[in-house]
């Protein structure tokens, strides 16, 4: 795992955790908007490190590395943590372990529930193929296989593939969808998702509310998986700023 620092030391502390098949650079537009006001750390998940060979380990291992880093560098306290997809799953594990204090936690389309076991292997190989084609395909084949993707996401997948390749995608996917969030701790926990991923996201939101009735669910019209961060980083930045303006 790698930790990339941006912004202003001494300002409110913001931790960013990316998703499966992309790198920490997916956050660069958001970082550009917030670096004047926050002490920002963008995490690189093992298996998806930019320019570095690595292998995915486990949700618990990644969460443990984050906890250790925050304890060492930030006295065990973050003002805001934002996790996207796999990053949200890792963040939920950090909150479950309850070893550091996070004032505001954003789980953006985090998969908190396991899938039926029979479905995990076919889907993880399908997801691995998806990311492989992001890296290798151009022209007609790119259009045919990825008409449902937005271009910025394709570019991010290309960056991540060389690090852990298909094994990292398959191992990460299996780990995400065979683990269930059993408990969660935090003063302000938010779950975000877009309407275009509602079929998958709504059960996760219901599960979170069953564990933490005080959690806040935010639904973004017209947005797909990861699209709010990539298409509207200004809105994400504004919401983060609003969280900390009265702290």
Predicted features, each with a name:
Residues 4-52:
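Conserved HGGG/HGGXW glycine-rich cap/lid loop of the alpha/beta-hydrolase fold
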Residues 41-82:
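Active-site loop/oxyanion-hole signature of alpha/beta-hydrolase fold enzymes
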Residues 96, 102-132:
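Flexible "cap/lid" loop of the alpha/beta hydrolase fold
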Residues 117, 133-183:
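Conserved alpha/beta-hydrolase catalytic His-Asp/Glu region
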Residues 185, 191-193:
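Short beta-strand/loop motif that positions the catalytic acidic residue
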Residues 187, 201-210:
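Short alpha-helix in the alpha/beta-hydrolase fold that links the catalytic acid
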Residues 223-233:
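Catalytic histidine-centered segment of alpha/beta-hydrolase-like enzymes
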């Amino acid at each position: 795992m790698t930790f990339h620092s941006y912004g202003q030391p001494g300002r409110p502390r913001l931790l960013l955790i990316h998703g499966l098949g992309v790198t920490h650079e997916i956050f660069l537009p958001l970082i550009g908007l917030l670096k004047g006001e926050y002490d920002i750390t963008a995490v690189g998940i093992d298996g998806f490190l930019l320019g570095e060979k690595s292998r995915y380990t486990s949700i618990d291992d990644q969460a443990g590395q984050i906890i250790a880093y925050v304890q060492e560098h930030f006295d065990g306290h973050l003002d805001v943590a934002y996790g996207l997809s796999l990053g949200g799953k890792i963040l939920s594990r950090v909150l479950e372990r309850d070893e550091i204090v996070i004032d505001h936690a954003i789980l953006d389309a985090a998969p908190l529930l396991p899938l039926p076991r029979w479905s995990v292997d076919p889907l993880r190989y399908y997801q691995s193929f998806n990311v492989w084609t992001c890296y290798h395909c151009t022209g007609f084949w790119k259009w045919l296989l990825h008409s449902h993707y937005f271009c910025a996401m394709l570019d991010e997948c290309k960056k991540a593939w060389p690090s852990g390749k298909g094994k990292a995608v398959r191992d990460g996917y299996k780990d995400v969808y065979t683990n269930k969030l059993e408990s969660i701790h935090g003063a302000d926990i938010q779950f975000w998702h877009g309407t275009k991923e509602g079929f998958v996201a709504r059960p996760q939101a219901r599960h979170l509310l069953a564990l933490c009735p005080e959690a806040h669910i935010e639904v973004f019209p017209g947005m797909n998986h990861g699209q709010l961060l990539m298409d509207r980083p200004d809105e994400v930045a504004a919401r983060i700023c609003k969280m900390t303006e009265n702290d």
